[in-house]
């Protein structure tokens, strides 16, 4: 993937590196703990996920390295959520200065989530859509205080061993080769002190709950059910506090979105960006049809734990026939006729999940 590297200056003078690729409406990828614009692309899982998100270059992807990591300024004194929100602001303003767009969609995961929330709350006019994966609004929610302190201390004491230990949370299914690659990547993406400071901030000092009601843009919250770093309830609790949120629990235990089966994540993001109301996702000047989005408030989208459902969804083969019966005794076609959310979301996993939820509600009427 060709990726020109650009640099923007944050409000406190820190230089932030970012890359651009593709065309269309910008989707800003806000990384988690640490990142490296060049080394990330050497990870085949990351590259495949990014390639799928880019839609063959039809979607403009913007990636950044937060301060203290990757190609951005490494020697920094402050890595707080507030400062990382400044980093996002610098990149977005630089992007707006060089394109015909006046807003971006944001996809943030893990520790990048609180910074994206803080930025979107301060600049809602700059964010068309907000997508959050595997993140939280308040550090107290993860319930891993003792383990978190041990990891922070280990990383500060020995970055090589500490980076190895963290693999179990980022990608629990790693074999030795993947674990070795991650250790090399981590140690070349940030110093041990910065890595420890970032982890400590995320695990003990994050609280953006006061910003959530300021988020007026459509928001999608994704969370894997068996996430080993931030448990599922972190995403559920976050979504419940957002005024315009969809919550989509997904199968899997990997924390980073590009590990494990990322096809449902890519598909959910594509569906969300395509169906959310009132925003343009092509080149400047192109208009999208108005789809009549549902009113504000949390909508929970349910995937059932059917055997092989993930592979079927990623293969695009799980398309029930119009007469396929739901547990409520109604057909998908009959549910579609009565459910306005169905029309909003199109024939995709989000739509099918809403149909199941609607049919269950009808059983209780």
Stretches found by the model and what they are:
Residues 10-73:
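Conserved HGGG/HGGXW glycine-rich cap/lid loop of the alpha/beta-hydrolase fold
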Residues 117, 121-122, 127-157:
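Flexible "cap/lid" loop of the alpha/beta hydrolase fold
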Residues 215, 221-223:
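Short beta-strand/loop motif that positions the catalytic acidic residue
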Residues 85-104:
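Conserved acidic catalytic loop of the alpha/beta-hydrolase fold
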Residues 228-234:
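Conserved alpha/beta-hydrolase "acid-adjacent" motif
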Residues 286-365:
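Catalytic NTP-binding/metal-coordinating core of nucleotidyl cyclase/transferase enzymes
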Residues 142, 160-206, 210-211:
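Conserved alpha/beta-hydrolase catalytic His-Asp/Glu region
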Residues 245-288:
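Catalytic active-site module of serine/aspartate enzymes centered on a nucleophile-bearing elbow/loop
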């Amino acid at each position: 993937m060709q990726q020109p590297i650009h640099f923007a200056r944050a409000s406190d003078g820190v230089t932030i590196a970012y890359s651009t690729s593709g065309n269309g409406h910008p989707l800003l990828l806000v990384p988690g703990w640490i990142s490296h614009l060049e080394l990330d692309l050497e990870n085949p899982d990351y590259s495949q996920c990014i390639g799928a998100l880019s839609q063959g270059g039809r979607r403009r992807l913007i990636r950044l390295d937060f301060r203290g990591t990757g190609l951005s300024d490494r020697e920094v004194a402050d890595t707080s959520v507030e400062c990382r929100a400044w980093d996002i602001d610098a990149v977005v303003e630089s992007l707006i200065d060089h394109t015909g767009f006046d807003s971006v969609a944001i996809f943030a995961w893990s520790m990048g989530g609180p910074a994206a929330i803080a930025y979107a709350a301060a600049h809602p006019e700059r964010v068309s859509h907000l997508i959050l994966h595997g993140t939280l609004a308040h550090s107290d929610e993860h319930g891993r205080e003792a383990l978190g302190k041990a990891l922070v201390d280990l990383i500060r004491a020995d970055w090589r061993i500490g980076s190895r230990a963290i693999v179990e949370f980022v990608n629990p299914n790693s074999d030795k080769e993947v674990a070795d690659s991650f250790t090399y990547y981590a140690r070349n993406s940030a110093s041990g002190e910065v890595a420890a400071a970032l982890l400590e901030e995320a695990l003990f000092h994050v609280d953006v709950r006061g910003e959530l009601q300021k988020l007026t843009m459509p928001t999608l919250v994704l969370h894997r059910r068996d996430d080993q770093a931030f448990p599922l309830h972190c995403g559920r609790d976050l979504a419940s506090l957002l005024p315009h949120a969809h919550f989509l629990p997904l199968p899997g235990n990997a924390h980073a979105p590009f590990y494990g089966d990322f096809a449902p994540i890519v598909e959910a993001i594509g569906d969300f960006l395509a169906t959310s109301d009132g925003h343009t996702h092509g080149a400047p000047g192109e208009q999208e049809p108005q789809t009549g989005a549902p009113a504000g408030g949390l909508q929970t989208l349910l995937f059932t734990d059917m055997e092989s459902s993930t592979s079927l969804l990623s293969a695009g083969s799980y398309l029930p026939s119009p007469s396929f019966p739901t547990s409520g005794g109604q057909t998908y076609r009959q549910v579609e006729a009565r459910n306005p959310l169905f029309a909003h979301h199109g024939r995709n996993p989000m739509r099918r999940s809403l149909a199941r939820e609607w049919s269950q509600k009808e059983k209780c009427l």
